[in-house]
């Protein structure tokens, strides 16, 4: 039966007790992580968020009643112990911070009993994720998950402190706002007071932080909750958290400077990792040409090589056909993989097809320097030698080629180089490689909508020298946009914003938005632009992704206390769920039943 803790005050967390406290009385509280009965002695590993502390129950010290209670303890019971800190009676446990001491218990109170948990509360368990998420309150007790959540809190706290010291003001922006076009789907909230009308949960604080710049708050920050109704991936959630900021009277270099110093500060304080400054910069075009990705992983090489000029006159129709259609032929060199079995090469071909390739061509260079190739019969010996030389091919290498439109070739080889690097063990999670990617295209063509859409968002300022092409050649316009990339993952992005009303109007028209639609959706921003707008720029980090990489995890679900799963549901609470008819009536909502075909 559970006992009261009245009259008790915890004096220490478990790992706050040390050898310096030997001989002192302490009161500790937590969960029973493990219990060992040695007959006349009982040992308990007591766990709280700080770690583990060993408790010794000796009948000669605690008395028979207390010893009997200790005998009844089971894993996950919540207990309070008063006792004296003593030197460990047995061998020192070098794996524990408190491994040289223990508490000789004088009193024991059982504050709460526990049923047998559905999985062990230990590190590196093999329990399926859906079970762990269903019992998330238990999962969060495990040290490896707990350390992630604690790290997340530390990153947020340090970020606030750093930016406050840089003159930023933390200002909250609305959670119930207006649905606007562009971007992902909004989560909509029906209004009871205004039947038939809806709020939208913010995809970002973008418009409000720009209006704060119009209002004279020249440095804004917020740890902001954001919502996007889109399909989930390993690094996506329907609700997520941004480190959001905006600055007035700045240019690209000013924003990058603040954020480089922020990143260096966070990595030093949290991980004791030195970030070399300045961080490397690369234009979007260079990143795509060299790595096939706008978020390249720089922990390894395997750069793309454009071999179009070498193969343009060969007899291989796959290559020449791609070039005749305005595409390119590019390849990567998987060093030391020339002896890869055909079965594995076929698996790589299937992988490439998943990214849009029609196939992959390859050259395997044998140790004697001879070649095995899927297209050798279409090439002269001189052409093959020139191709291998251009690829820096050596004995034992595997050369892989894709031929198609540039967008497909980049997509295929960009993904393939990461897949190969993973197979080759080149992705060291302790090696942090940062990169700024700059000068993104202002627009990208949407085949689905048959129009240009904003690559970032419609408030991004074009490069000054490209402004004249907004109407005549939008596909060639570059943006004053920048992403910060870490180990192949975009952890943040931002841009210089449009602050002239006429340029913003031209941007809307380039996106196919009429003046009427633009005013309907963004009139509040355009009105603010009428009364003096400072040049401004900003950036937002995905806090979840940043902490995921810092914690060396593979999924952001491991660094979020209560995450959703891939169908955007919560296994802990069973949200989303049906609501009763009265609630729907109050919101003027009627649910139509799906019609079934007879």
Enumerate the predicted regions with their spans.
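Class II aminoacyl-tRNA synthetase catalytic cores and aaRS-like
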Residues: 1-598
